[in-house]
């Protein structure tokens, strides 16, 4: 499992994507880093099986104790609910995939200017 710190716009918007250039396809997951500050990526590359998971989340895979020690455990009171916003998009046009890469590059450049560096978005 990889834990990413995605670069985000001023409003918290960010995305992760998986691109298959051979097939000319991309899957984009857009979300708010304010609502879901963690992004986990996991892979299974066993023979005959290739799976990748992109999981925006409000806590990491480190567990409750880790977040309690850090003071950032996400609490949800009894009977409460929350709404999170995610958008999934499939791209199948070369120009759309190129635009996605430009969007990634712009977001990373902006984040580096603001905070002096940013982790890679999950996109080659």
Label the predicted regions.
Residues 20-124:
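Active-site pocket scaffolds in enzymes
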Residues 1-28, 33:
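Active-site/ligand-binding surface loops and adjacent short beta/alpha elements
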